[in-house]
Amino acid sequence: MQSEHIRERINQFDNKLYLEFGGKLFDDYHASRVLPGFAPDSKLRMLMQLADQAEIVIAISADAIEKNKVRGDLGITYDSDVLRLIDEFRGKGLYVGSVVITQFSGQHSAAMFKKRLENLGIKVYILYYIPGYPGNIPLIVSDEGYGKNDYIETTRPLVVVTAPGPGSGKMATCLSQLYHEHKRGVNAGYAKFETFPIWNLPLKHPVNLAYEAATADLNDINMIDPFHLEAYGKTTVNYNRDVEIFPVLNAIFEQIFGQSPYKSPTDMGVNMAGNCIIDDEVCREASRQEIIRRYYQAVDGIADGSRSEEEAFKIELLMKQEHITSTDRSTVSPALVRAETTGAPAAAMELPNGKVITGKTGDLLGACAALLLNALKELAGIDHDKHIIAPTAIEPIQILKTKYLGSKNPRLHTDEILIALSATAAESEDAKLALAQLPQLHGCQVHSSVMLSEVDRKTFQRLGCDVTCEPKFQ
């Protein structure tokens, strides 16, 4: 359905469409959480259906290169992510035509990155900084504005413009290309693919509220598209930045083409996700859970200094709109109760069958390591009181940690308990059976009564568990 809709949009123009691709093409876990059944790579697979028609242009701003901007979810710089994306796309059989460096005003590191890409055989184009952008339309749509930018040579009908993250200049790249194509007599088109907010769901639908929670740091606000309402008398949802920029876009389209092909920001979109929802209540509940997860991310961020209080306040307001609290997350109360009764950190996990398992801090294991072991035993049908890892397998790791590696904490972390379990599995059928349950942990919900160590957080992430923590340091 989605790929066919994009083909229709290509045909509306001179067989040339510049598609601004928002959000994540790979590993879109937010979408998969709030839309159960939506695979994290759904957008990529959709694009692969258009592989013979599509080429990819990756945009990165010169400022992001200069400031070593980091992609939060992966912990790598934007310029490193450009190289990663190129490899990922090519590995999937998609054609990467070029990289465009936007907002360039002579930044040395951006020039060095351009040279590095060219040495790798990658075509690189430059879009220059335009004073007064995006308001100074007479300058922007002139030989001194878009006209100064490089014309990106493309060979296929669909040009997908993507980027490592927001603020990379994707829209500016598309509009600059429209200007240059028009100068060359080609009536190219522009469209936008954004999964969220979903335009044909109600404004206050939990799926759309979960998007607001996810972008609370950007101050994105969902709103009724006033231009669409005026043009068609129909209520649709868009977000504030697209609504605010639309008059400017419209004026740019009119300057280039004589008239705008679109009457509203919603018209520009090609997203069909809203038409694919078959169980609304499941999506509503999944989105409520996502809002709670985002709340915990925000308050944990306040504790470690990476987030603002305003972000948490905004998500709290969304929770009040949905009449939910943090304890509506099934693992929160069990983790807190276990921590209170033991007087030490504890954690809880909801298994695929809905049962909640807890883990406490002990002499040998940290709370998360104990939780992991308890969950695997439960899934394997092994009695809770049965030891499946001999103390003789744990003690050498403790000695290594404390005596040789200088650690003050002798308790095993999640990665270490998995290593001990793996070593034991060579001789123990129970350990082997427990280890085989690891794939079942994917998608399980975890809550900790304290903030996790980096190693525990990364282990749960690799296992595919969704983790939240109380904003308390151990």
Give the location of each predicted region.
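A short, polar/charged loop-to-alpha-helix boundary motif
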Residues: 364-380
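Residue-level structural signal for beta-strand termini and adjacent loop
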Residues: 189, 361-362
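The conserved Walker
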Residues: 165-166
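Substrate-recognition/cap regions that form aromatic- and gly/pro-loop-enriched pockets
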Residues: 383-395, 399-409
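Hydrophobic positions on the alpha1 helix immediately C-terminal to the Walker A/P-loop
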Residues: 173
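Phosphate-handling active-site elements
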Residues: 184-188, 381-387
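Flexible phosphate-sensing "switch/lid" loops adjacent to ATP/NTP-binding sites
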Residues: 1-161, 177-329, 333-336, 344, ...
